[in-house]
Amino acid sequence: MSHLVLIGLMGSGKTTVGRRVAAALGRPFLDNDALLQRRSGTSARDIEAGAGPNALHDQEAAVLLDALATPQTAVIAAAAGAVLHPRVVAALRGLDVVYLRATPAVLAARLEAEQRMATDDHHPSVR
């Protein structure tokens, strides 16, 4: 068996679906964004703001390649920008890859809700 890799745009449901599928299959779940934050000590948003989108995508790709090298088969939610990296494209060949789609309206609503939660988490009156 090989890893099951979920790809799609931000807000397409990779993390939510990934957790559910991993639980159903009895496999570990690896989330590219969470692994990046654990490795770097900061969020993807902060990396992009400080170093730019290319640096972010390079770091996301490095984290994803490490996850793909894990010997235990897992369900992996890939960061949207990471799957465009040439080394990641090559590494995904022959693996089980599922593209999650959502309508633009659904994506916008999910990203807006995520942005609200991120803002609320950092707002002094909410703490």
Where are these regions (language model features)?
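Pre-Walker A (Motif I) flank of P-loop NTPase domains
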Residues: M1-V5, P71-Q72
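Hydrophobic/aromatic beta-strand patches that form the interior of the parallel beta-sheet core
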Residues: L4, L30, D96-V98
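Structural motif
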Residues: V5, V75-A77, Y99
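P-loop (Walker A) phosphate-binding loop of NTP-binding proteins
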Residues: L9
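Walker A/P-loop
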Residues: T15
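ATP-dependent small-molecule kinase phosphotransfer cores
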Residues: P28-A91, M117, H123-P124
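A glycine- and Lys/Arg-enriched "phosphate-lid" helix/loop adjacent to the NTP-binding pocket
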Residues: G94-R127
